UniProtKB/Swiss-Prot annotation:
Species in which this protein is naturally found: Rhodopseudomonas palustris (strain TIE-1)
Alphabetically ordered keywords of this record: DNA recombination, DNA-binding, Transcription, Transcription regulation, Translation regulation
Origin: domain of life: Bacteria
The protein, known as: Integration host factor subunit beta
GO biological process: DNA recombination; regulation of DNA-templated transcription; regulation of translation
Segments for region (Disordered): 83-104
NCBIfam families (UniProt xref): hip (TIGR00988), PRK00199.1 (NF001222)
Any one of the GO CC terms: cytosol
Pfam family, one: Bac_DNA_binding
Amino acid sequence: MIKSELVQRIAEHNPHLYQRDVENIVNAILDEIVDALARGDRVELRGFGAFSVKHRPARAGRNPRTGAHVPVDQKTVPFFKTGKEMRERLNRDSGDDAPTSDTA
């Protein structure tokens, strides 16, 4: 699902809201999450999950084509940890349809 599909689904479930207003709300929520992460804050949506940032130190990498060692700069990356309710719902909804590993 892409953002425009999310906006459309929310607008369909809330006919009293214009789709443009829903789009503005979704954009505002996403902007606030990104701004909080940029400040180094953690964003927790109880039951859904938590967004945070992780700092990856500089390291020596390798060019897979040539095998040459290349320096990789330190970077900050977004991280998402699912909430308990989401994990439970995903596991409950998948039920017996979940793929199993073939260890025979």
